[in-house]
Amino acid sequence: MPHNMKPHFTALGAAYQLHYYLWFKTHYLEPLLASAERQQLAKEVILDTCNRHDYSLLESDFDSTHLRLLISLQPKHSVSHAVKLLKGNLEYQFRKAFDSEKLLGRGYFARTAGRVDLDRARNYVANQITHYGYQGEWTKPLEFRNSAFRSPAFSFAHYSTILNYHLVFATQERIPIFDEVIGPKLFDYVIAVGKKHQFAVDRISLLPDHMHMIIEGTPSVSVEEYVLAIMNNTQHWMTKRYDGVLKQTGAWDVWQPSYYAGTVGEFTSAQVAKFFAKK
């Protein structure tokens, strides 16, 4: 979308479940969390930080050298900002309580988890077209599997992340506006949007009245920012390229001002929680 264009969508409704597994390590893997007292303080600081910033701590596990968390975030939250607040508050409170110079190492690991694992989510997206009863050769251009996609899609110097999201968008008033002609061109455009806004497309299923996507993102960008980038850019693109379709259907907004976003990963949230319980 050109820089001088006013965004069509600014505030959106959302249904979401965004779960993240975070793993921090102590400075030089020194046993700085060996005592029950230090582990208790760490848990209190993490709980307080989560409460103050509208995060939900679902599970936690500590040993002498590592902190492992399963947290739930809102679409407006970015992983990198949540990590910055959690680590910053831990450092501050431990410095106050124990006169410690440094508690945590520089990096972190972050991985998404969800109701279902990534493979099941991919299959779910791939089966949407037949699920809704669409059949025949004309439906093949409505499904896109990115042969160039590799995960991890992004690499960073001091931390490692694999952040996979399942996104669903419905057209304005569920009006059918997409077809096999628009589909392939729309997929190419969404890939271009991803390159600009730091997400990689894994796969897309496009139905006449809604779209499913699986993408991999970066920790510095929130789900809400990804969604706004996709919705605003594709709305502008449809207006520019297919104004005849929008005029005929009356769907000038293209999308409803709402969406679904769910995290998916190698393991489900329940599997991660079960792992914590066994520690």
What are these regions (language model features)?
Residues 2-279:
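Charge-rich, low-complexity N-terminal segments
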